[in-house]
Amino acid sequence: MNSNTIKTGIDRAPHRSLLKALGLTDRELSKPFIGVVNSFTELVPGHMHLRQVTEAVKAGIRENGGTPFEFSTIAVCDGIAMGHEGMHYSLASREIVADAIEVMAKGHQLDALVLIPSCDKVVPGMLMAAMRLNIPAIVVSGGPMLPGRFEGNPVTLSTVFEGVGQVHAGKKDEAWLHELEAKACPTCGSCAGMFTANSMNCLTEALGMALPGNGTIPAVYSERLVLAKETGYQVMELYRQDLKPRDIVTQSTLKNGVAVDMALGCSTNTILHLPAIANEGDIDWDLGKVNEVSEKTPQICKLAPASETPLAALHEAGGVSAVLKQLLDAGLIDGSTMTVSGVTMAERLKDAKVVDTEIIRPQSNPFSQRGGLRILFGNLAPEGAVIKQGALSSQDFVFEGSAKVFNGEVPAAEAIRNLEIKAGDVVVIRYEGPKGGPGMREMLGPTATLAGMGLDSDVALLTDGRFSGASRGLSIGHVSPEAALGGDIALLKDGDKIRIDIGKGRLEWIVSEEEREQRRQEFAAMAVKPDHLKPELRQGYLGRYAYFVQSASKGAALRRVKE
């Protein structure tokens, strides 16, 4: 076992002395050392209850012959970080999570890991660490929040963001909004729709890295604690079998993940996180393959924000396992991939079934024939851009409009709130990419405000930044190359015509080649490129992040240092 490096032999007496200072017995020292990564924080509703989950995990480890060691890592709440400079740090925190786990696992020679995330960037950060370290590892999250109830309807955090738009449009008053905000988030857990956190927790099941139920058992259910205890027990089985993350997450596994992504209508952020996870396992990722999977994978679930149906309803309908079983029976996923259950995906799914066909529809009656996400290519995005087509009224939507260009989110948000944006406009928010932001901020404020104003089908929003899983409407993100790298989005001016064809997967700037080349020359001649950032954001971690981060088309993963 790895931990023998720090506890066996005469030369390790000092190490054993320090371990005994922790109160460990010789019996405990003789057992495998299992790291339990607790991302508890009092700042994040999705993580506020993780101490209890962690205790259940440790009980399961002890029950099956291991010695657990709890340590912590950071967690950022994207909702609280939204709409101000804090959002620069959200995506960038993913790499800190992965690095912190690497440091602790390597520094203390741990034998296996149980990873306990909940929210947006913590889930992929932990999966990236698992792939990088490649020691036995398993994930159990904190689970989704239950929805609130307001005016007789289920509500989630996205309802509040869209409520802000209703107030700005004069449709509602502040007293109404104040009442809504008090009822939208009634429990602990990750926000209650198919937003980024729940998308990634569901996909963790699809990737085989968590036990069934991880993505959907509500945070407040005792069933979540049972799952945590079983997860702690199961990590010891993984250790004994020497079953590692790279044995589980393969090219076929990732393709399964994309299929489930399409069937569930997950967040566009998954298209950043899946390639970053693949990168850590040295697995090739082709963004264009997403459309191949989407074309043949119907969307069979439609959860908030695409509908009012909360994530908890998916659990009652049969959970991710029921969705996987549908896809397996239709030949849309590979059932031979391994899982942390110690059996193949097909074996794990043999008893899975759909309980509610209104929530998980049959393949013969999907919500749409294509999957929930679409990658767009064209002269504005030769490396790709992404839209959540499952949240549109039609997956063959065509939109042509005039650009309103903003260098950064703040002036765009002000223009929307000041009612300067009209039907037929294409709001372009640039210099918000991984490098240009830096940190690729989410644009939930602008998209939710437009939705609240009733403009989400009449105004497009185009950015080299990204969107919250709670965003809907004509929201196109991850435009690559980004403006800071000289992508054509940097050349746009107010009034330029932009055409979006969802059915054909195209994003085009309608411009002559002569005009485009003239714009390119003007851009190249600019002594100082547009930069809306405060100088302090280039210092510290964000400065280092901006230096190493790659394109969104590569998952905004950091460049590896060359020897």
From Swiss-Prot:
Cofactors demanded by this protein: [2Fe-2S] cluster; Mg(2+)
GO cellular component: a single term: cytosol
Binding site for [2Fe-2S] cluster: C119, C191
Role: Functions in the biosynthesis of branched-chain amino acids. Catalyzes the dehydration of (2R,3R)-2,3-dihydroxy-3-methylpentanoate (2,3-dihydroxy-3-methylvalerate) into 2-oxo-3-methylpentanoate (2-oxo-3-methylvalerate) and of (2R)-2,3-dihydroxy-3-methylbutanoate (2,3-dihydroxyisovalerate) into 2-oxo-3-methylbutanoate (2-oxoisovalerate), the penultimate precursor to L-isoleucine and L-valine, respectively.
Identification of the protein by name: Dihydroxy-acid dehydratase
Residues where Mg(2+) binds: D78, D120, K121, E442
Residues annotated as transmembrane: none
Subunit structure: Homodimer.
Top EC class of this enzyme: lyase
GO term, biological process aspect, one: isoleucine biosynthetic process
Pathway annotation: Amino-acid biosynthesis; L-isoleucine biosynthesis; L-isoleucine from 2-oxobutanoate: step 3/4; Amino-acid biosynthesis; L-valine biosynthesis; L-valine from pyruvate: step 3/4
Catalytic activity: (2R)-2,3-dihydroxy-3-methylbutanoate = 3-methyl-2-oxobutanoate + H2O; (2R,3R)-2,3-dihydroxy-3-methylpentanoate = (S)-3-methyl-2-oxopentanoate + H2O
Modification N6-carboxylysine, positions: K121
Organism: Desulfitobacterium hafniense (strain DSM 10664 / DCB-2)
Cofactor note (record): Binds 1 [2Fe-2S] cluster per subunit. This cluster acts as a Lewis acid cofactor.
Entry-linked HAMAP family: IlvD (MF_00012)
Example of a GO MF term: magnesium ion binding
Catalytic activity, EC: 4.2.1.9
